[in-house]
Amino acid sequence: LKNSNRFGIVKHTVCTDPELSIQAKGLYSILCCYANKNRICWPSISTLADDCGSSQTSVKRWIKELKLHKYIKRVGHKLTIL
């Protein structure tokens, strides 16, 4: 993350969900760091890939995983953290 003072609140249920990959949990944590007070964020896939040190394809896969488990939802270009 470019701003080292950035932080986020992560739900315990996400951290302990055995159905969720550790990579998706890490991405969720990063999304929480980008979220505003309404739990909405809109970082680019490229930015998320850079933050994770992974490919854009991997980030897209983890976003799908988080959506499948209903931890996030997409509305247009924005993600809402549920």
Task: Please place each PLM-identified region on the residue numbering.
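Winged helix-turn-helix DNA-binding recognition segment
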Residues: 13-26, 31-82
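N-terminal leader segment of winged-helix/HTH proteins
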Residues: 1-4
